[in-house]
Amino acid sequence: VYNVSQEGSFLMIKILLCCASGMSTSLLVEKMKRAAAKQNVEAEIWAVNAENTDLKDVEADIIFLGPQVRYAKDEIQETVGSIPVYMIGMKDYGMMNGESVLEQALEYLGK
């Protein structure tokens, strides 16, 4: 269930990034926030440590996993149920390409 208005447009997109420590992903979060502001996309974007966070009750429209936690994708998908879970590509992660990851989120959510 996405955060969608009656007119069918997104009110605010909630994007969660999960990685091993949360440190490197926090830089990607900042770049994604800047890209969202530049594109006038209302988005709540945050990062958590996938191994130390209970994702059972997370409220997100989409979840992206850093390359270092790809092994946990199936387990995380099972935990979060209907929330779509995607991998951040190695190139986008390595280059901290927030604009590209944001574009992927919008594409996956049909925005």
Residue ranges of each PLM-predicted region?
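Ser/Thr/Gly-rich flexible loops in soluble cytosolic domains mediating phosphotransfer, phosphorylation
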Residues: K14, P84-K111
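Conserved active-site segments centered on acidic
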Residues: I13-N52
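Cofactor-cradling patches in redox/metallo enzymes
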Residues: A43-N52, V58-E59, L65-V85, M96-N97, ...
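Short, surface-exposed acidic/glycine-rich loop or hinge patches that mediate macromolecular interfaces
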Residues: G22-M23, P67-R70, K91-D92
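Short, well-ordered alpha-helices that flank and scaffold nucleotide-derived cofactor binding pockets
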Residues: E30, R34, E78, E103, ...
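Short, Lys/Arg-enriched N-terminal segments with co-localized hydrophobic residues
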Residues: V1-L11
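Short glycine-rich or small-residue beta-strand-to-loop segments that form or flank ligand, phosphate
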Residues: K14-A20, D61-F64, Y86-G89
